[in-house]
């Protein structure tokens, strides 16, 4: 027995003997040790299994653990989850059972029998699991680990309970979840799936309405909505948006300034905001953007831009002061939240709204650009990508905040007209949107897993007019206005020589891998990393790592004081002063 293995087994023996130490802390140490051993055995594996359930399944397959041994490890995982999240009190009998389960797994993974000293103080093998949840006919959400698929079923392992055999999940069900069928061949073994609105069938199979691939990898709502173009909604549109620079910064700059105007009108008290003062704030907030915007270097275009700014300022004033209180809207700016951010692990998306009532009954997404002026003659309609964005915000409130979608009132504010448009679209459209999200995530995973120029070359080759023109458009509009931007990308890519292309693909792979690990975490990292730790790490883990401020109390708020007193400007630093209510000596700021 080498020294490393000896120390691993010795740590188990010490945990059993250290009776003075609280069981909850010993559970944490047991879990940390097991996760470290699992990570070390996966260091040279391309699979980014950052979730412990997926790691256990991978190790079970790699080292031929029996189903009983794997179920015992899952029982340990679930019990430690409950203990570390304070959902239950730790029990000594269960702790020693779980130490036995981990030791038995080590004996196979480390190819070294359990030392007699440790074996003698552990209970006998007990493979029977008690970690089964009560099943109901309709389940809101189930997290599972994908194994394989055939033409009718996905075969998966549940993450939140122990199962003796794979669950069978029906897919390709017409009108229910058939939109996800195209993406199933891209699923990989041990991938995490969220099954939403799941029906338990009489034959013991499951039929979900949504199948969400790798939900810990959050896709930005606005980026996902931008996949919906006039010519189609292919996932390669996501790649093109990432790679093609913005030709004209004017619309983006105007949108940012319009958002500033909305802030001013929402927070205004008796005295109305002044346009000139607001523009001065805009110049302070966006000095570089205004200085480098090419259109503003032309005197006529500069004049038109600031005329547009004043028009949007007036339209926002009209909307906030008049339309908000009109019959049918009942929007109250005094009880609103500006730019609330949301994370929706259920659907694997994230986003930020422009305006929301505090009770989440109504929300507004503001657009400074054009609506669809041509779909219906003489009528202004929201663009498809804007409708998609609103549907996704509704879905976030439904699945993350528990707000019934039928009680939500979403509005699109087109400040160009102005038009405050009730933007309720068909809920059935959410399914194909999430299916596109899955295909985007599969592309991202494939890029970082293969990490090879040839794979990336094939992926980026999808950015061509034939592939992206899913609606088979023809005629002047397609040929002169839509196709050229797609063709231009391919021309620039093809103009590179072999070395330049290889450099581009390698750089793209590197950035994609860094982005993937920054979101989902890195299997090779000693600690939990990535944005997903927000919901995957327990409070104890965050606290011990010094990565959370909690139980804080504001004792002085200087953040929102006005900059003026009458016409006189007042200089002050916007500050917030907090006081700890729970003393701690550990803080860690990355």
Where do the PLM segments sit?
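Amphipathic alpha-helical interface elements
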Residues: 1-122
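Structural motif
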Residues: 17-28, 226, 244-255, 380-385
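Short amphipathic alpha-helical face segments that pack within enzyme cores
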Residues: 28-32, 253, 257, 388-396
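Accessory interdomain/linker segments of ATP-dependent helicases and helicase-like nucleic-acid enzymes
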Residues: 113-162, 458-589
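Charged, glycine-rich intrinsically disordered N-terminal tails and low-complexity linkers that flank
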Residues: 133, 142-145, 164, 168-294
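Mg2+/Mn2+-dependent nuclease catalytic core
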Residues: 158-188, 333-439
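Pre-ATPase regulatory/linker segments immediately N-terminal to the P-loop/RecA-like helicase/translocase core
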Residues: 234-237, 413, 418-419, 427-431, ...
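A non-catalytic, helix-rich entry segment at domain boundaries
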Residues: 261-338, 513-515
């Amino acid at each position: 027995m080498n020294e490393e293995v000896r120390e691993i087994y010795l740590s188990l023996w010490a945990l059993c003997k250290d009776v003075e130490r609280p069981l909850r802390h010993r559970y944490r140490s047991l879990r940390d040790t097991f996760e470290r051993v699992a990570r070390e055995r996966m260091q040279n594996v391309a699979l980014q299994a950052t979730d412990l359930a997926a790691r256990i399944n991978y190790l079970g397959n790699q080292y031929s653990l029996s189903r009983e041994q794997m179920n015992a490890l899952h029982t340990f995982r679930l019990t430690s989850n409950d203990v570390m999240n304070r959902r239950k009190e730790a029990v000594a009998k269960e702790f020693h059972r779980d130490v036995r389960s981990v030791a038995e797994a080590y004996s196979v993974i480390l190819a070294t029998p359990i030392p007699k000293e440790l074996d003698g103080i552990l209970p006998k093998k007990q493979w029977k699991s008690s970690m089964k949840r009560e099943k109901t006919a309709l389940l809101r959400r189930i997290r599972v680990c994908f194994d394989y698929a055939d033409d009718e079923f996905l075969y998966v392992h549940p993450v939140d309970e122990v199962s003796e055999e794979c669950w069978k999940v029906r897919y390709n069900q017409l009108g229910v979840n058939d939109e996800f069928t195209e993406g199933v061949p891209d699923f990989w073994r041990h991938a995490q799936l969220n099954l939403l609105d799941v029906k338990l069938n009489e034959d013991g199979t499951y039929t979900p309405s949504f199948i969400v691939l790798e939900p810990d990898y959050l896709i930005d709502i606005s980026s996902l909505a931008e996949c919906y173009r006039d010519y189609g909604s292919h996932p390669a549109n996501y790649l093109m948006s990432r790679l093609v620079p913005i030709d004209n910064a004017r619309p983006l700059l105007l949108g940012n300034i319009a958002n500033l105007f909305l802030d001013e009108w929402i927070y205004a008290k008796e005295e109305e905001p002044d346009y000139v003062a607001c523009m001065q704030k805009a110049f302070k907030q966006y000095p570089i953007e205004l200085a480098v915007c090419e259109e503003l270097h032309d005197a006529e275009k500069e004049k038109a831009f600031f005329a547009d700014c004043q028009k949007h300022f007036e339209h926002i004033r009209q909307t906030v002061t008049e339309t908000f209180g009109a019959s049918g809207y009942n929007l109250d700016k005094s009880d609103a939240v500006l730019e609330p951010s949301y994370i929706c692990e259920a659907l694997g998306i994230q986003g930020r709204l422009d305006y929301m009532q505090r009770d989440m009954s109504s929300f507004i997404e503001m657009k400074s650009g054009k609506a669809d002026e041509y779909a219906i003659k003489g009528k202004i309609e929201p663009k498809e990508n804007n409708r998609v964005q609103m549907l996704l915000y509704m879905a976030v409130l439904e699945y993350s905040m528990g707000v019934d979608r039928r009680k939500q009132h979403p509005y699109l504010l087109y400040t160009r007209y102005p038009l405050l448009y009730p933007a309720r679209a068909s809920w059935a459209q959410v399914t194909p949107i999430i299916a596109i999200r899955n295909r985007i995530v599969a592309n991202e995973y494939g890029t970082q897993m293969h990490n090879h120029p040839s794979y990336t070359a094939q992926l980026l080759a999808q950015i061509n007019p034939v592939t992206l023109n899913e609606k088979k458009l023809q005629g002047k509009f397609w040929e002169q206005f839509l196709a050229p931007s797609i063709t231009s990308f391919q021309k620039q890519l093809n103009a590179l020589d072999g070395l330049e292309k290889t450099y581009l693909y390698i750089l793209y792979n590197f950035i994609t891998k860094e982005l993937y690990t920054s979101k989902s975490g890195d299997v090779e990292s000693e600690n939990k990393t990535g944005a997903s730790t927000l919901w995957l790490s327990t409070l104890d883990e965050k606290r011990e790592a010094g990565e959370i401020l909690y139980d804080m109390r504001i004792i002085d708020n200087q953040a929102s004081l006005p900059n003026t007193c009458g016409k006189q400007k007042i200089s002050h630093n916007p500050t917030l002063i907090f006081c700890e209510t729970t003393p701690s000596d550990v803080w860690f700021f990355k």
